[in-house]
Amino acid sequence: MTNMSCAYELIKSLPAKLEQLAQETQATIQTLMIADPNVNKDLRAFCEFLTVQHQRAYRATNSLLIKPRVAAALRGEELDLGEADVAARVRQLKQQLAELEMEIKPGHQQVAQVSGRRKAAAAAPVAQLGRVGVVNE
């Protein structure tokens, strides 16, 4: 195996290795019997951090290796540019679009809920005001 193909394999294996390390660390933390709730909270936060880092490593590695030129360069191969670049870019854009949609949906739902609450809240005080400025005779 050449240095170039070693680099490709090393980068490709990073998410799996990171996942394994994260799982082992999380399993070890879960076996600890710690009475302090603040320490347990910090350890849970650390476990969540490990999960997020694994997900980021997976996405970053996938985004890197999906590019034909990068993958070919890491393997030490030559690549005919053209259709492969276009196809890879389309796949990358689809992936980014899917990720953005997943991020936008919860925010869109929250905006709709807040908007509905504001309309209801605005209607109630106006109805309660009655006639302002009229002196009872």
From Swiss-Prot:
GO terms for cellular component: host cell mitochondrion. The dsRNA-binding region is required for suppression of RNA silencing. The N-terminus is involved in homodimerization. The alpha2 helices of the dimer bind parallel to the stem of the dsRNA helix. Encoded on a subgenomic RNA (RNA3) synthesized during replication and which is co-terminal with RNA1. Keywords: Host mitochondrion, Host-virus interaction, Inhibition of host innate immune response by virus, RNA-binding, Suppressor of RNA silencing, Viral immunoevasion. Disulfide bonds: none annotated. GO terms for molecular function: RNA binding. GO terms for biological process: symbiont-mediated suppression of host innate immune response. This is Protein B2. It is found in: Host mitochondrion. Binds double-strand RNA (dsRNA) with high affinity. Suppresses the host RNA silencing-based antiviral response. Gene3D superfamilies: ESAT-6-like. Homodimer. Interacts with RNA-directed RNA polymerase. It comes from the Viruses. Belongs to the nodaviridae B2 protein family. Residues 1-79 are annotated as: RNA-binding. Its main location: host cell.
